[in-house]
Regions:
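Acidic-and-aromatic substrate-binding clefts and catalytic sites of carbohydrate-active enzymes
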Residues: 7-12, 32-39, 63-69, 182-186, ...
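Conserved, mostly hydrophobic/aromatic
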Residues: 24, 47, 78, 117, ...
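Hydrophobic faces of well-ordered beta-strands that scaffold small-molecule active sites
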Residues: 3-7, 28-30, 56-59, 86-90, ...
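Glycine-rich anion/phosphate-binding loops
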Residues: 64-77, 104
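An alpha-helical appendage that flanks or caps ligand/catalytic pockets
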Residues: 103-144, 190-332
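Short, acidic/polar
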Residues: 9-20, 74, 159-167, 319-329
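Active-site mouth loops of central-metabolism enzymes
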Residues: 1-11, 61-69, 149-160, 214-218, ...
Length: 360
């Protein structure tokens, strides 16, 4: 298996990415969250010139954040800085959309978007809608070497639900999943293979990546130790953020756990968090407070909700032997790469996870 990192994107992400490269990681994936993080292409550009081997991926690009030629140009420009090391991940948007008060981007529109971007990267001239008008667009002089469309840029799609998995197969793209639970990861991997076959594609030709959010516990360490809470508390609260808006946008947890609390033992926490959420103002833009620090830090008023049970249930945390066993089962389920989040300020996670991975 390959192993990668993903990270909320600071402008100087290259420092974390270089550390991951030196530790033997294969990939680094950058979040496209425009009101929380630095610009994804700025950060990836710096990482491209500061690293030598590690592959750099958009994790993931949200179509509504930039028009087709801008996205294609960004990827082709990165490809000029790091030829053959750029990966193009796309998705309907979670954090980047929720944090501006929007639900997921339409799957049908994402299909057209990905087709157009990849068409431009092949040197073709797709027709797209710009300001309601159909226009043919393409790179006018790629032969100058200002960008690089000679080296292929593999495409992957974040597909947590059945419609996006069908789209992934239709476009013959690699697949990005999230490790919500072992049952979810195994079941969705089987479905992804079925979708590839239904689309006339060979599942073995496509890579399956799984983003896993967890901490490496020391022997005897509590799930709510200060160290663990710093590393994965922001992951646990992400699920609380998600549940508060599930009625409007659906839930990350919906496919395998329904909306609301994913475990009966957490119902009280979810109820109390809703009371906190409903206290946020302005009432028509509670998302402005709800998503502050999303996947980066726990806000002061959220701290009391980050319990050992919440972390144990909602994150992929465990001791090194436990995590190695889980990773082996992910490999058996068909995954080619495990990607772990490095929480800002907790870059030591790179070294902790590297020690887990080197024995797998």
């Amino acid at each position: 298996m390959d192993f990668g990192i993903t990270l909320p994107t600071p402008a100087d992400s290259w420092k974390t990415v270089k550390r991951a490269e030196d530790a033997g990681f294969s990939t680094a994936w950058f979040y496209d969250t425009q009101v929380l993080s630095a610009d994804i292409f700025v950060a990836m550009g710096a990482a491209a010139v500061k690293t030598d081997r590690i592959r750099l991926g958009t994790g993931v690009l949200i179509p509504s954040n930039r028009i087709v030629p801008v996205a294609a140009n960004g990827l082709a420009s990165l490809n000029a800085l790091a030829p053959g090391r750029i990966l193009a991940g796309f998705g309907t948007g979670f954090t980047g959309r929720r944090s501006i008060g929007l639900g997921p981007y339409k799957v049908s529109d994402m299909r057209d978007y990905i087709r157009a971007v990849t068409s431009m990267l092949r040197g073709e001239t797709p027709e797209i809608l710009i300001e309601g008008k159909a226009r043919k667009v393409g790179f006018l002089n790629p032969e100058t070497g200002l960008i690089n469309i000679k080296d292929p840029i593999p495409v992957s799609i974040s597909a947590l639900g059945p419609r996006t998995r069908r789209l992934t197969a239709e476009l013959d793209a690699d697949w990005i999943n999230v490790n919500f639970s072992e049952e979810f990861s195994a079941a969705t991997a089987r479905d992804m293979d079925a979708q590839y076959r239904a689309a006339g594609k060979d599942p073995a030709r496509r890579r399956k990546l799984i983003f896993s959010f967890g901490a490496v516990l020391q022997e005897g360490e509590a799930y709510d130790s200060p160290r663990v809470k710093a590393q994965v508390g922001p992951v646990a609260t992400m699920f609380l953020h998600d549940a508060m808006e599930a009625q409007n946008y659906g839930s990350l947890l919906g496919e395998f756990a329904g909306s609301g609390a994913p475990d009966p033992g957490l119902e009280q926490i979810f109820r109390e968090y809703r009371a906190l959420y409903e206290s946020y103002t302005p009432t028509d833009a509670r998302y402005l407070t709800l998503h502050k620090g999303h996947l980066m830090f726990v806000r002061p008023e959220e701290g009391r909700f980050v319990t050992a049970d919440l972390i144990r249930t909602l994150t992929s945390s465990g001791t090194a032997p436990e995590l190695r066993d889980r990773i082996r089962r992910l490999k058996e389920a068909g995954y080619d790469e495990v990607v772990v989040q490095v929480t800002p300020g907790c870059e030591v996670m790179i070294d902790e996870w590297a020690r887990v991975f080197e024995i797998v």
